[in-house]
Amino acid sequence: ALPIFRMAQSPDPEARIYTRFVDAPEDANGKLQSIAFKNEQSFNFAFDIVDALGREKPEKLAMLHVALDGTERRFTFKDMKDASSQAANYFTSLGIRRGDRVMLVLKRHYQFWFAILGLHKIGAIAIPATNQLVEHDFSYRFQAAGVSAVLCTADGDTAHHVDIAEADTGMKLT
């Protein structure tokens, strides 16, 4: 059997940000009894969770990224809030708008998180994809999903495959 790890929780349920959006009563042993979502129509993970933590607990560690060479990068919730806002502004400057479908092909780069949160902030739809796709895979996905923009890694041949697929489909991607 796999070990079970319990997260240390604040004794005050109101101190937990997620309680603004989720009703998740637990029994005396901490077992989830049910789950119900609140404010579904206006919920935005980037604003309502990440940015809230960036304001309320700015120095709290949000992400630890360890690169293949062992380089560690630490990002606080304030870092995530600020970087995702910069990404959102950049995407908006490119013409990406609410409802646009944007494919993210970023391998395991930490920038994926800034990008996906930035897209959430502007209401765009993020479509994560593996960097193992080739031209025909991209062509199919571009057409099937109505992709309007692609953010991809410069590693390997990914950008080349995206360019060929864009030309093959006749689509003009941002």
Residues covered by each model-derived region:
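Extracellular interaction modules
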Residues: 1
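Flexible, non-catalytic linker and terminal segments flanking ANL/adenylate-forming cores
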Residues: 4-46
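Structural core segment of the AMP-binding/adenylate-forming
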Residues: 5-14, 93-94, 117, 121-174
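AMP-dependent adenylate-forming
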Residues: 49-76
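Adenylate-forming
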Residues: 50-54, 80, 84, 102, ...
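Conserved N-terminal alpha-helix of the aminotransferase class I/II PLP-enzyme fold
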Residues: 66-68, 79-90
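Conserved AMP-binding/adenylate-forming
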Residues: 70-75, 89-136
